[in-house]
Amino acid sequence: LMVCIAHQYLFLHPDFVFPGQNRLSLVSLKFFTRMTAIGATKKLALSFRKMREVPSERIVVVPPLLRKEVLETTPVNGDYLHGYLLNSGFSEEIRSWHKVHPNVALHIFWDKKEVRPEVKVDSFLSFHQLNDTLFIRYMAGAKAYATTAGFESVCEAMYLGKPVLMVPTHIEQSCNAFDAVQAGAGVVADRFDLDALLELSRTHRPNPAFSHWVKQADWLI
């Protein structure tokens, strides 16, 4: 028996709503998603919300699998913005915004190699090498979170009640981000528009149904 588990299997669900993307791109996305599950007896599709089973596709929709450290963390509403840059090139956008808003504290994680664990630009802007424990600690104490819209960290932010700015860089992330917005995660932008994130942090209300759904993972999987 082979069971496959991933968020992208939701793209094969007939009720999944896609953003207005190029039709050919969506066909390709679904094709490659199917290819990853050839021979699977069951596809567990990680989702922001409860959805029906699809026996014809062998799809069972399940909650996101969050790390134990996230589930055990007590969030507080801090005064800094937290972020994760999949591509360290985005750091220039962060620096430019910081010059205009020098008094907003920023703790940004990146994948940049050959730099110190913390690159402290000044007392309000720090770039951190990715470190799971530190990342969760900063997430728990942040005002809000900015990311390139990977599924896992968006779920972590939602669980901890943090509004999210998502900047997708490819079609899979665009679909994730669109779905996350429907689930109340936050907003999507084509750049790291931290003004939008600050504004969102003033009005955002966490989605209690999401936390309840996450807590069902143990007995649904």
Question: Positions of the model-derived regions?
Answer:
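Nucleotide-sugar donor-binding patch of glycosyltransferase catalytic domains
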Residues: 119-120, 163-206
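Short, charged, surface-exposed secondary-structure boundary motifs
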Residues: 12-20, 70-73, 116-121, 139-140, ...
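A donor-sugar binding/catalytic signature common to diverse glycosyltransferases
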Residues: 1-4, 137-176
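Leloir-type glycosyltransferase catalytic cores
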Residues: 35-42, 49-52, 185-221
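Active-site-proximal region of nucleotide-activated glycan assembly enzymes
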Residues: 2-61
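Short loop/helix-cap segments at secondary-structure boundaries that form the rim of catalytic
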Residues: 1, 37, 50-59, 72-76, ...
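Donor-nucleotide binding loops and adjacent catalytic segments primarily
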Residues: 63-141
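Short, acidic/turn-prone active-site loops that include or flank metal/cofactor-
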Residues: 7-11, 110-113, 131-133, 169-173, ...
